[in-house]
Amino acid sequence: MAKNKYSEPDYWSKKAFAENYPARSVYKLEEMNKKFNLFSPNDKVLDLGAAPGSWTVYVLRFLNKEGRVTAVDLKPLDSSVYDERLNFFQGDMFDKGIIKSVKELGPYDAVICDAAPATTGNKTVDTARSSGLVELALYYAQEQLKQGGSFVVKIFQGGDQQIHLNNLRKCFKTARAFKPEACRSSSFETYLIGLDFKG
Protein backbone atom coordinates (compact mmCIF):
# COMPACT_ATOMS: atom_id res chain seq x y z
CA MET A 1 0.00 0.00 0.00
CA ALA A 2 1.35 3.45 -0.90
CA LYS A 3 2.36 5.76 1.89
CA ASN A 4 0.33 8.87 2.57
CA LYS A 5 2.77 11.64 1.70
CA TYR A 6 1.06 13.91 4.26
CA SER A 7 2.05 11.48 7.04
CA GLU A 8 5.74 12.01 6.27
CA PRO A 9 7.30 14.64 8.55
CA ASP A 10 8.49 17.73 6.69
CA TYR A 11 10.33 20.89 7.76
CA TRP A 12 7.20 22.49 9.21
CA SER A 13 5.97 19.44 11.12
CA LYS A 14 9.43 18.90 12.62
CA LYS A 15 9.57 22.57 13.61
CA ALA A 16 6.12 22.32 15.22
CA PHE A 17 7.21 19.29 17.25
CA ALA A 18 10.38 21.08 18.39
CA GLU A 19 8.42 24.16 19.46
CA ASN A 20 5.66 22.21 21.24
CA TYR A 21 2.81 22.94 18.85
CA PRO A 22 0.24 20.19 18.15
CA ALA A 23 0.40 20.69 14.36
CA ARG A 24 2.36 22.38 11.56
CA SER A 25 -0.60 24.63 10.69
CA VAL A 26 0.60 27.10 13.32
CA TYR A 27 3.16 28.55 10.90
CA LYS A 28 0.44 29.54 8.46
CA LEU A 29 -1.17 31.69 11.14
CA GLU A 30 2.18 33.02 12.32
CA GLU A 31 3.04 34.20 8.80
CA MET A 32 -0.38 35.81 8.32
CA ASN A 33 -0.18 37.59 11.67
CA LYS A 34 3.29 38.95 10.93
CA LYS A 35 2.18 40.17 7.52
CA PHE A 36 -1.28 41.52 8.36
CA ASN A 37 -1.14 42.33 12.12
CA LEU A 38 -4.22 40.28 12.92
CA PHE A 39 -3.92 40.48 16.70
CA SER A 40 -3.07 42.87 19.52
CA PRO A 41 -1.78 41.56 22.88
CA ASN A 42 -4.98 42.16 24.85
CA ASP A 43 -7.43 40.89 22.19
CA LYS A 44 -10.35 38.52 22.56
CA VAL A 45 -10.04 35.94 19.79
CA LEU A 46 -12.54 33.34 18.52
CA ASP A 47 -10.89 30.22 17.06
CA LEU A 48 -13.32 28.08 15.03
CA GLY A 49 -12.35 24.53 14.06
CA ALA A 50 -9.58 24.78 16.62
CA ALA A 51 -8.49 21.14 17.14
CA PRO A 52 -5.86 19.95 17.70
CA GLY A 53 -5.03 23.43 18.96
CA SER A 54 -1.95 24.86 17.25
CA TRP A 55 -3.66 28.13 16.30
CA THR A 56 -5.08 28.37 19.82
CA VAL A 57 -1.64 27.88 21.37
CA TYR A 58 -0.06 30.44 19.03
CA VAL A 59 -2.66 33.07 19.92
CA LEU A 60 -2.37 32.37 23.65
CA ARG A 61 1.41 32.78 23.44
CA PHE A 62 0.96 36.04 21.54
CA LEU A 63 -1.61 37.54 23.93
CA ASN A 64 -0.86 39.12 27.29
CA LYS A 65 -2.59 38.14 30.54
CA GLU A 66 -5.60 40.28 29.64
CA GLY A 67 -6.17 38.50 26.32
CA ARG A 68 -8.73 35.72 25.92
CA VAL A 69 -9.39 32.89 23.46
CA THR A 70 -12.67 31.10 22.84
CA ALA A 71 -12.20 27.91 20.81
CA VAL A 72 -14.73 25.56 19.18
CA ASP A 73 -14.36 22.15 17.54
CA LEU A 74 -16.18 18.84 17.21
CA LYS A 75 -12.97 17.13 18.29
CA PRO A 76 -11.14 17.71 21.58
CA LEU A 77 -8.07 19.90 21.76
CA ASP A 78 -4.73 18.22 22.33
CA SER A 79 -4.25 17.40 26.02
CA SER A 80 -1.34 19.86 26.16
CA VAL A 81 -3.59 22.80 25.26
CA TYR A 82 -4.70 24.37 28.52
CA ASP A 83 -4.72 27.94 29.76
CA GLU A 84 -6.83 29.95 32.21
CA ARG A 85 -7.45 32.46 29.40
CA LEU A 86 -9.01 29.76 27.20
CA ASN A 87 -12.67 28.75 26.96
CA PHE A 88 -13.20 25.64 24.83
CA PHE A 89 -16.55 24.35 23.59
CA GLN A 90 -16.55 20.86 22.09
CA GLY A 91 -19.40 20.63 19.63
CA ASP A 92 -20.72 21.53 16.20
CA MET A 93 -20.16 25.12 15.06
CA PHE A 94 -23.64 24.98 13.49
CA ASP A 95 -25.26 24.15 16.86
CA LYS A 96 -27.46 26.96 18.23
CA GLY A 97 -26.29 26.25 21.78
CA ILE A 98 -22.65 26.63 20.74
CA ILE A 99 -23.43 29.86 18.88
CA LYS A 100 -25.18 31.23 21.99
CA SER A 101 -22.31 30.25 24.33
CA VAL A 102 -19.72 31.81 22.03
CA LYS A 103 -21.73 35.02 21.73
CA GLU A 104 -21.97 35.37 25.51
CA LEU A 105 -18.15 35.58 25.69
CA GLY A 106 -17.87 38.12 22.86
CA PRO A 107 -17.63 40.42 21.08
CA TYR A 108 -14.24 39.53 19.59
CA ASP A 109 -11.33 41.42 18.10
CA ALA A 110 -10.54 38.59 15.70
CA VAL A 111 -12.31 35.51 14.33
CA ILE A 112 -10.05 32.81 12.87
CA CYS A 113 -11.05 29.52 11.27
CA ASP A 114 -8.76 26.75 10.04
CA ALA A 115 -11.61 24.24 9.80
CA ALA A 116 -11.60 21.80 6.89
CA PRO A 117 -14.35 19.38 5.87
CA ALA A 118 -13.92 15.63 5.81
CA THR A 119 -12.53 15.17 2.31
CA THR A 120 -13.85 12.66 -0.22
CA GLY A 121 -11.23 12.98 -2.96
CA ASN A 122 -13.87 14.54 -5.19
CA LYS A 123 -12.73 18.14 -5.63
CA THR A 124 -16.21 19.43 -6.47
CA VAL A 125 -17.70 17.93 -3.31
CA ASP A 126 -14.77 18.97 -1.14
CA THR A 127 -14.75 22.59 -2.32
CA ALA A 128 -18.52 22.81 -1.80
CA ARG A 129 -18.15 21.56 1.78
CA SER A 130 -15.30 23.98 2.39
CA SER A 131 -17.47 26.78 1.03
CA GLY A 132 -20.14 25.94 3.61
CA LEU A 133 -17.62 26.29 6.43
CA VAL A 134 -16.49 29.65 5.05
CA GLU A 135 -20.11 30.86 5.06
CA LEU A 136 -20.52 29.77 8.67
CA ALA A 137 -17.27 31.39 9.79
CA LEU A 138 -18.27 34.65 8.10
CA TYR A 139 -21.64 34.47 9.86
CA TYR A 140 -19.82 34.26 13.20
CA ALA A 141 -17.61 37.18 12.20
CA GLN A 142 -20.51 39.38 11.12
CA GLU A 143 -22.39 38.64 14.35
CA GLN A 144 -19.53 38.78 16.84
CA LEU A 145 -16.63 40.91 15.59
CA LYS A 146 -15.93 44.33 17.04
CA GLN A 147 -15.65 47.21 14.62
CA GLY A 148 -12.09 47.22 13.27
CA GLY A 149 -11.70 43.48 13.87
CA SER A 150 -9.85 40.87 11.80
CA PHE A 151 -10.99 37.66 10.10
CA VAL A 152 -9.13 34.66 8.65
CA VAL A 153 -10.70 31.55 7.14
CA LYS A 154 -9.39 28.57 5.20
CA ILE A 155 -10.95 27.79 1.83
CA PHE A 156 -10.34 25.12 -0.79
CA GLN A 157 -9.51 26.73 -4.13
CA GLY A 158 -11.61 26.01 -7.19
CA GLY A 159 -15.05 26.69 -5.75
CA ASP A 160 -16.75 29.91 -4.68
CA GLN A 161 -13.60 31.69 -3.55
CA GLN A 162 -14.29 34.86 -5.54
CA ILE A 163 -17.89 35.03 -4.30
CA HIS A 164 -16.70 34.79 -0.70
CA LEU A 165 -14.00 37.38 -1.31
CA ASN A 166 -16.62 39.76 -2.70
CA ASN A 167 -18.74 39.17 0.41
CA LEU A 168 -15.76 39.98 2.62
CA ARG A 169 -15.24 43.25 0.77
CA LYS A 170 -18.74 44.30 1.81
CA CYS A 171 -17.88 43.76 5.48
CA PHE A 172 -14.19 44.69 5.73
CA LYS A 173 -12.21 47.68 4.51
CA THR A 174 -9.55 45.30 3.21
CA ALA A 175 -10.13 41.75 1.92
CA ARG A 176 -7.78 39.43 0.05
CA ALA A 177 -6.70 35.84 -0.53
CA PHE A 178 -3.32 34.67 0.75
CA LYS A 179 -1.47 31.34 0.63
CA PRO A 180 1.18 31.03 3.37
CA GLU A 181 4.52 29.37 2.65
CA ALA A 182 3.74 26.61 5.16
CA CYS A 183 0.89 25.31 2.97
CA ARG A 184 1.95 22.12 1.21
CA SER A 185 2.75 22.76 -2.44
CA SER A 186 0.29 20.04 -3.47
CA SER A 187 -2.54 21.45 -1.33
CA PHE A 188 -5.37 23.42 -2.90
CA GLU A 189 -6.12 25.27 0.33
CA THR A 190 -5.67 29.01 0.72
CA TYR A 191 -6.93 31.65 3.14
CA LEU A 192 -9.28 34.60 2.91
CA ILE A 193 -8.40 37.55 5.11
CA GLY A 194 -10.61 40.45 6.17
CA LEU A 195 -9.12 43.47 7.94
CA ASP A 196 -10.82 46.41 9.68
CA PHE A 197 -14.38 45.12 10.08
CA LYS A 198 -16.89 47.83 9.19
CA GLY A 199 -19.37 46.75 11.87
Curated annotation (Swiss-Prot):
EC class (word): transferase
A Pfam family reported for this protein in Swiss-Prot or TrEMBL: FtsJ
Reaction equation(s) it catalyzes: uridine(2552) in 23S rRNA + S-adenosyl-L-methionine = 2'-O-methyluridine(2552) in 23S rRNA + S-adenosyl-L-homocysteine + H(+)
Active site residues per record: K154
Protein family (similarity comment): Belongs to the class I-like SAM-binding methyltransferase superfamily. RNA methyltransferase RlmE family.
Primary role: Specifically methylates the uridine in position 2552 of 23S rRNA at the 2'-O position of the ribose in the fully assembled 50S ribosomal subunit.
HAMAP family per record: RNA_methyltr_E (MF_01547)
Full protein name: Ribosomal RNA large subunit methyltransferase E
Organism listed in the record: Treponema denticola (strain ATCC 35405 / DSM 14222 / CIP 103919 / JCM 8153 / KCTC 15104)
